[in-house]
Every structure is written in C-alpha cells, then in structure tokens.
C-alpha cells in the first residue's frame, strides 16, 4: 500500500494512535506495555555542549535556548551528578532490552597488513537485534518514552533507525510513526508495515523534520531523532546508548588509537566520544582515541576548513544512511575534541572498499565500507601511523542496502 504524502498539512494524531497500518487504517492491536525502567538517581538533567547551562529533561529536544539567542544551534547532553559511582553512567538501569550491544570486535590481521597498520578491528554492529547500531540508541529512547509515559515514538529515518524503532516500539507496547521518503527500500517498508508502524512519505528532510517537530508537540509523542533545522541531533538521552561501544572496544581490543565512523549528523560519533570521555574522567584510559568521521561528500570537511557550522552542504550519494546536507555541533565536537577530523569518500571508492571487505568475508552497507577507503586516505596522508591500533565501525551489513549488489568497479 502507498503511504500518504502529507505536504506540510498536519492534523492532530488520533487518540487511539497506539498502532497503525501504513495505509492509515487503525489496527485493533492490544499489547502489554513494558514497565517503566529504573532511572539513574544520579541523572540530574540535560547540559549544553557549548555553554554548560543545565536544563530539565523533557520529551522534546530543542537544544540550548541560551546559545540559540547568541546565534548558535547546540544540542544538549545527559548530565550526571559528580558523585555518580559508575565509570560510565547511563540514564537508565537494567530494564527494557532486546539484547543490543556487546557486538564483536573482529580482528582482521590480513586487512591490517594490507592497509599498513599494526591492528585493524571491525566493530560489527550488524549483530544487533535489527541489524544496525541504531538499536543501541533506540533501546535507551524507548526507556525514556516509558519513563515519561509516552505512547508513541516518532522519527525521521531513511531505513535503519525506522526498522529499529518499529521493532523496539512493538516489543515495548508503544506505537511508532516514521517520516520517510518515497524510495524507502522495500525490505524496510515491509518490516514497518508488519509491525504496525505508520509511514509518512516526504520529498525532503525539511518535510520530514517538520512533521516530526509537529508530532513532538502532542502529548504522549516522543521524537527519537532530529527535527530541527539547523540540525541538532537525536534525543540526548537516547544518544547515550552509544557510549558502551567505547568500553567494549577497550575491553575487547585495547585502547584504539583511531576509530573510523560513518557519519550523517554525528549521533554515533558523539556517543562514542562521550563514552571514551567518561573512561578518561574515571582514570580508565590516559587519552582519547582520534575519531575520524566519514562522509559521502564534503560537509563537516567544509566546516573544519572554515565553513559555517549551520550551513547547508547538499550532495548526491548512494550511501543513503549517511546522506543529508547538515552538520551538527555534535559531530564537530566529536572530531575536534579528539584531534580527529572528517574524511570524504565517494561512492566509487566505497564500492571498491566493499569488494575488498567481501573478499575478507565481511558484508557491509556502503557507508560502512567507506570507512575502509577512509583508512587508506588517512594512511596515505600519514594521519594514521603504521603502528596504530584502528577500529572501523561496521554500522550495518549489505542485506538491506538499496545500492547492493554493486556494479563492477
């Protein structure tokens, strides 16, 4: 069935909007709601990434008002009391989960030798329950939705986040609404429809974000992803779900020197940075790894070269998971605070890298394969030395990638 195109004509969501079909027909579904998870008693609020102003936690995420008045569009982060006992505090204790996290860090000695580094590990996030790193963020986002008595998740997504949200919402007894685009891969669309998620189709990010922003103002709706332009990033507490990647990398492969991360708006990169920052503050590590954010065309690269952080940097790419024209303070901070940077990898380079990974028995979505091409660039420029311990983030495999299988390169 074809989902409706709303074209900015929004109506209040129906009162019985717990679950919908993609055609807009209500589904008579009764599911048990998951109990509220235990909130960390040391979680004190949300804090600005730039000015450190402290704000209460709500279901909306509109950035720092003080910085906005000064002309900056800056996200907030979770803030914990200084006497929090954990080296890596999280917003919620054990509760709702589908088994996300603790993904393997695959040691790839042959690829390490080929690319001239001492150690190369692939952090395989495709082993998460719905096949991507998004499950980590979604799990914490669902915990917040349950904590604040929300009944529906709403988000803008090109695929992986939508599938993750639909599965987790279904399991938790929540509704799910997804603002997407006409070309959403059929494999994703079928999963959303089967799980009762409602799809809305828009021509561009502006339309999708406007829809999510509108929905977020209604009682009981929780926006999981960004809805602001200039972009801010996803829900701050949800992004905390990426922090454990840092501890997993440390435990499984030692402290990396460099981590190469496919990036759209920087949620994943900032979450990894925050995890290592916690470990540094706790004395578990002596330094931060350098984070390299891989993009399909120049966005953050242009900002780091002097462009406006809140500018628009459009481009075309088959790397649909990391497409988009915006740059956030999140990704800028993740790169600059760690001494890393941005690497541009075009589609042909990414396809060639995906073939190299396939030869090593690794399936990767195109933007994840781009990380291997980025490693080659960083070695060629001597930004990464021969004695380095490098981790590549494999965000998802190729199975649902609309650009797969590749044409010959």
Locations of the language-model features?
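Small/polar-residue-rich loop-to-helix segments that shape phosphate-bearing ligand pockets
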Residues: 177-255, 316-332
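A short, small-residue-rich loop immediately preceding and capping a beta-strand
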Residues: 141, 145-168, 172-181, 257-268, ...
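Positively charged, low-complexity intrinsically disordered leader regions
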Residues: 83-150
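A broadly conserved sequence feature marking short terminus-proximal activation segments
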Residues: 2-54
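Active-site/ligand-binding loops adjacent to catalytic centers
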Residues: 207-226, 230, 278-366, 407-409
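Short glycine/serine/threonine-rich phosphate/pyrophosphate-binding segments
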Residues: 135-139, 154-172, 186-189, 265-272, ...
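N-terminal juxtadomain amphipathic helix
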Residues: 37-105
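Phosphate-binding loop/pocket of nucleotide- and phosphate-handling active sites
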Residues: 309-316, 370-409
